[in-house]
Amino acid sequence: MKPIGPLMWEHRLIEKMLSFFEAATRKINEKNKVDPLFIDTAVDFIRTYADRTHHGKEEDILFRDLIKKQLSQEHARIMEELVEEHKYARNKVGMLVDAKERYLKGGNTSQEIVVLLNELARFYPIHIEKEDKHFFYPCMDYFTKEEQARMLQEFFEFDRNMIHEKYRTVVDRIEAQSV
């Protein structure tokens, strides 16, 4: 299996999660009420799965190794765009958290939340298509079969460590709140 296999599987789960955003925005528009639990769950999914786990493998492993190669101008440009797009998504998620917090304090941010959910739901499919159809496959040509096998193993190790990282952070946050 090529190392892009797990990345593309992760894309399918991200797309599935995003498919729930439309129903969430419809409910907000119908009831003029935000479900903070849905927002928290969506944010946790995007931050932990889409960003830290998925984008982490891309940036910390795939892109790190690609930088060492003689990339074509097109592939170098696309990789730079992808990094900027990851930053864009992080920013939008931060804005979503901020809007939800203001909502919980009585702010009228329901439409801001709708806009942010819609922006994320529009952004990710385009970003995913760019990776799946224009970047991942051609980039594998820069690596030998042995390099690809090592990268795949590094992806698996990265995933194994993620659960520990996530819950270490949870415990640290609870500890900080209890002091």
Where are the regions that the model predicts?
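Small-residue-biased structural context
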Residues: M1-V179
